[in-house]
């Protein structure tokens, strides 16, 4: 069986859109579009669209990536049995009506000239389910606690799941209002960094003292019973106001001062504290001794390295 997995903006590529920031949609921020081809569960090819169109973090529909994978597999799109799109369309204010098998098929037809009947082979996979499965299947574990966390996708910012012998049980969901990805990314502009520069914040953190702003950051979240947590800000604007009050504003070309390092350190400390709270509770509740992490927040190698220690 041939399976093609794809992720990216579910609309035809337009040559006049060179700015990744234009990919902002109600269901989320499409970025790092990609394609992957599997044959009978074995990886044949995988590549991000940015490697081919040379636009960093490109969120456009991965037409070039799809072509690359099919060429590596030596097949045409008509030979693919299942086309899995990594989002279902969300819900409520995060809903994107453009996400449907028919829409994905129409984009495939526009970009690759395939038969419109291909819609019958398109399946939509919930964003965080895709994250969770990718981590678990790649781990080789029979059973594991699986935690996903990022900005948000499909109207959810993360899942906590227990997996035993390929059977997933979702134990908790992280609402968008409590998104760790959005929380961690909120001070980027105040520190003079661009979008997708969370790695710079993480790299800056070791040079700072988290104690300087720890109390201020502790006012931004609450650790709750049963491994839950909540952000105290009622809106993203309120969160941004909180960072503005720290007096850490830096121009993109300005010098990095100790206050910027201390803010980064306090943010890193806060996210690690929240994640540790979640992991400790669900490790105890499930008895799992193995852990899988996925989603943008899991790319914080400073935090994950501490959890492994």
What are the functions of these language-model segments?
Residues 1-309:
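Short acidic/glycine-rich loops and adjacent helix/strand connectors
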């Amino acid at each position: 069986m041939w399976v093609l997995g794809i992720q990216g903006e579910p609309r035809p590529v337009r040559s006049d859109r060179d700015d990744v920031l234009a990919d902002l949609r109600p269901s989320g921020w499409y970025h790092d579009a990609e394609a992957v081809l599997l044959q009978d569960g074995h990886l044949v090819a995988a590549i991000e669209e940015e490697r081919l169109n040379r636009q960093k973090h490109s969120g456009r529909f991965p037409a070039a990536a799809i072509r690359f994978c099919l060429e590596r597999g030596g097949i045409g799109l008509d030979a693919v049995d299942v086309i899995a799109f990594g989002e279902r369309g969300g819900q409520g204010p995060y809903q994107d009506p453009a996400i449907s098998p028919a829409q994905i098929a129409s984009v495939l037809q526009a970009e690759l000239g395939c038969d419109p009947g291909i819609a019958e082979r398109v399946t939509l996979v919930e964003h965080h389910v895709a994250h969770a499965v990718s981590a678990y299947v790649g781990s080789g574990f029979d059973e594991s606690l699986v935690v996903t966390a990022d900005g948000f996708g499909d109207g959810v910012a993360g899942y906590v799941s227990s997996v035993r012998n390929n059977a997933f049980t979702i134990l908790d969901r992280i609402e968008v209002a409590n998104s760790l990805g959005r929380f961690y990314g909120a001070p980027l502009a105040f520190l003079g960094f661009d979008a997708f520069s969370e790695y710079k914040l993480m790299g800056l953190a070791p040079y700072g003292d988290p104690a300087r702003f720890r109390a201020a950051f502790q006012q931004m979240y609450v650790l709750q019973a049963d491994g839950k947590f909540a952000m105290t800000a009622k809106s993203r604007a309120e969160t941004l106001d909180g960072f503005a009050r720290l007096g850490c504003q830096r121009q993109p070309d300005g010098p990095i001062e100790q206050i910027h390092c201390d803010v980064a350190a306090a943010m890193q400390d806060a996210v690690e504290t929240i994640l540790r709270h979640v992991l400790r509770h669900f490790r105890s509740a499930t008895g799992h001794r193995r852990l899988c992490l996925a989603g943008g927040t899991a790319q914080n190698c400073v935090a994950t390295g501490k959890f492994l220690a």
